[in-house]
């Protein structure tokens, strides 16, 4: 089985969110299961310098972008048993930031066509091309409309498209069809690519892929509804026979409190008390009151409305009347950043607002905290709660998307469950469930059992990789 995994980012080379983690961990797990899996991403300027210097030039060729004929270099590097390819074009990718440029349509039109040209140039034919999010959305379109019709090399290649966040769809002016792809407006007028008055990369992928996946079972159902479907719900209902939810996992090599070099004291489920040394160290480092008995609640997140920050802002003053500590790590919208800075100023020994993305501090927060807050408005899968479980930090989540699938509400009478959850997007419900969690925290026997349940949860990539592999095999035999 040969699989080409196409993404706009991949850890450890470069990442801005969960997609980068998936593109770094899932291919590695597939390779362990005997799949010849290769990953391709753009060669951005910001790629990890240490790794960038190890990239080896393979070959170059020209790629048609409408009437343009652009240079494309292919570099490669093998990491953890997986070959990574890097599509090089200084004009498109050697600039600050991965996304948000005025010509993103052109940049990723080039990338998508370069990927299809690359496999022919390298004479490596995958059974399946696995595309991820809108930046790769035109690959299934190009494959079906053009490459399969022109060249027998491509005729039996299948395509999978994974939706990591349906809110970002890549919609651009219809003029990109002739300008960037050399097509007429038929695909716009027949509505296969039409979204409002634009052309949607993601809509095209949904229409032309052989299989559609998303990153949790619940999110696969949610995006078929008007509330979560971002006006593609009707199309996903039509395509529901080819839509599957497969839960993300986390990389158990990277996130392992037993040998994590970024935390102060390593521990595992058999010596949970060592976790408290991490707590005391972080309290001291952040200027909080050093007391292992005070419950510490952490958030490591983008500070955006999607993450439920409106709820936390609304209850923060009432919440902080409790004897707790709140640790925030992340950046995002300015009004949230300012609010948490103000809380830090007002409640200096109870609140630590770290308005930056700091991977070292993130690992320390997972290891030190007692509870991990994710009251998301929507959450396709979520990785934070999975990492928190691994480190014995009990997730407090809203029942949506992957949070609903991975967190089982604690039952104090049976001792079952691995976290706490609430259903409605309501600030008072959030406050109530946090206060309930605090009540359980002070019952040390119950809390100790809950932490063991959390740390014994299995969220590795192995099970998910099996589901992907079965899907690839099913597609390749069609």
Curated annotation (Swiss-Prot):
Reactions listed under catalytic activity: [(1->4)-alpha-D-glucosyl](n) + ADP-alpha-D-glucose = [(1->4)-alpha-D-glucosyl](n+1) + ADP + H(+)
One annotated GO biological process: glycogen biosynthetic process
Organism: Clostridium botulinum (strain Eklund 17B / Type B)
UniProt: ADP-alpha-D-glucose binding residues: 15
Top enzyme class: transferase
InterPro entries the UniProt entry points to: Glyco_trans_1, GS/SS, Starch_synth_cat_dom
SUPFAM superfamilies in alphabetical order: UDP-Glycosyltransferase/glycogen phosphorylase
HAMAP family recorded: Glycogen_synth
Entry EC no(s): 2.4.1.21
Protein name, per record: Glycogen synthase
Family listed: Belongs to the glycosyltransferase 1 family. Bacterial/plant glycogen synthase subfamily.
Top-rank taxon: Bacteria
Involved pathway(s): Glycan biosynthesis; glycogen biosynthesis
Chain's role: Synthesizes alpha-1,4-glucan chains using ADP-glucose.
């Amino acid at each position: 089985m040969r699989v080409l995994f196409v993404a706009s980012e991949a850890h450890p080379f470069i990442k801005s969110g969960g997609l980068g983690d998936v593109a770094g961990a899932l291919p590695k797990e597939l390779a362990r299961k005997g799949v010849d899996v290769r990953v391709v991403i753009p060669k951005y300027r910001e790629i990890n310098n240490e790794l960038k210097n190890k990239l080896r030039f393979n070959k170059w060729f020209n790629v048609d972008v409408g009437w343009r004929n652009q240079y494309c270099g292919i570099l490669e590097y093998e990491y953890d048993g997986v070959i990574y390819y890097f599509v090089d074009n200084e004009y498109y990718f050697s600039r600050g930031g991965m996304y948000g440029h005025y010509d993103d349509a052109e940049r990723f039109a080039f990338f998508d066509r370069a990927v299809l040209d690359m496999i022919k140039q390298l004479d490596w034919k995958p059974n399946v091309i696995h595309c991820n999010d809108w930046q790769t959305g035109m690959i299934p379109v190009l494959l079906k409309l053009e490459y399969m019709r022109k060249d027998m090399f491509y005729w039996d290649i299948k395509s999978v498209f994974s939706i990591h966040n349906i809110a970002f769809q890549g919609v651009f002016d219809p003029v990109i069809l002739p300008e960037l792809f050399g097509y007429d407006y038929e695909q716009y007028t027949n509505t296969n690519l039409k979204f409002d008055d634009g052309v949607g990369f993601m809509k095209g992928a949904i229409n032309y892929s052989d299989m559609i996946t998303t990153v949790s079972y619940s999110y696969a159902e949610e995006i078929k509804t008007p509330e979560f479907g971002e006006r593609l719900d009707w199309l996903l209902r039509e395509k529901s026979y080819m839509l599957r939810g497969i839960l993300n996992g986390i990389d158990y090599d990277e996130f392992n409190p037993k040998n994590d070099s970024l935390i102060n004291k390593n521990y595992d489920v058999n010596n949970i008390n060592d976790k408290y040394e991490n707590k005391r160290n972080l309290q001291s480092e952040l200027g909080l009151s050093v007391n292992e008995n005070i419950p510490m609640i952490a958030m490591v997140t983008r500070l955006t409305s999607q993450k439920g920050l409106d709820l936390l802002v609304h209850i923060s003053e009432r919440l902080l009347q409790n004897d707790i500590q709140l640790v925030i790590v992340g950046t995002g919208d300015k009004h949230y950043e300012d609010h948490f800075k103000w809380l830090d100023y007002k409640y200096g020994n109870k609140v630590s607002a770290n308005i930056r993305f700091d991977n070292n501090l993130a690992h320390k927060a997972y290891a030190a905290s007692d509870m991990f807050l994710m009251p998301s408005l929507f959450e396709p899968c979520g990785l934070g709660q999975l990492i928190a479980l691994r480190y014995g930090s009990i997730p407090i989540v809203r029942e949506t998307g992957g949070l609903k699938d991975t967190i089982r509400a604690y039952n104090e009478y049976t001792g079952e469950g691995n976290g706490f959850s609430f259903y409605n997007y309501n600030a008072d419900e959030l406050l109530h469930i946090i206060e309930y969690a605090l009540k359980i925290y002070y019952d040390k026997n119950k809390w100790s059992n809950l932490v063991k349940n959390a740390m014994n949860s299995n969220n590795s990539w192995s099970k998910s990789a099996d589901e992907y592999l079965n899907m690839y095999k099913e597609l390749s035999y069609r």
